[in-house]
Amino acid sequence: KDSKFNQTGYIDFAQTVMEKYNNLENAIKDNNFSFNNFKDLTEKQAENFMKGMQANAVPQAEYIASKYNFENHNILDIGAGAGTYLITVSKEYKTVRGKMIDLPQVSKIQNRNIEREHLKDRLVSVSCDYNIDFPKENYDDVFLFAVVHQEPKENVEKLLDNIYNVLKPNGRLFLTSFFLNDDKISPEFSVQFAIEMLANSKNGKVYTHNEIKKLLKDSNFSNIERIDDIPSPATLYIANK
């Protein structure tokens, strides 16, 4: 129950997911019935969802914290979920400071997690819609983990532009998602995930590798690096300002 890999919350949330799958035919016919990108989740549903997301994120967060240097960095974590990534990095690097931004019902849980880990002096979560009210401070790193597949292309374009603008010179963007190959029928996990996004988000889209690289280049990012061997079916992209 108390394991950091505990999946019980996600199992509870799966009931909500299955209710959406039962009407998948309507989504295919473009009669969209789905969550408005998770904005209408109750706090309990959000908490269950984040428990599962936290269990899935732990190996990736530990990988990133051990692989990359964050000494004295100020980090922005967008759509931070349970806060697993920023909390893990902050526990590894005692000089890290950072901010999480997320939906109101999620931000409350993030601040509870920050307090539980005794990190209130260095971390905070702020409730905001990143498509409307983007932070203005400057950051050494921006985390964008499991977010882009929740947004249509025009939102991702704006989001990447905003991230580029708040990054310090040579600042880094860390981005993960489940990407498709150009044929859009592989790899298998990403195809299955694309169907889940169709059933469970209003505007979600699973991008191809070439699509996300083009979006990054169009927002003026450079040194784009693709990393496939993270402990997840997801792919990690790192890009510099």
Report residues per predicted region.
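N-terminal hydrophobic or amphipathic segments with adjacent small-residue motifs
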Residues: 25, 75-77, 198
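Conserved Class I S-adenosyl-L-methionine-dependent methyltransferase catalytic core
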Residues: 1-73
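Short alpha-helix boundary/capping motifs
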Residues: 3-5, 10, 52, 77, ...
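Short acidic/polar alpha-helix capping motifs at helix-coil junctions
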Residues: 51-52, 75, 176-180
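Conserved class I S-adenosyl-L-methionine
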Residues: 71-81
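Alpha-helical subdomain
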Residues: 80-241
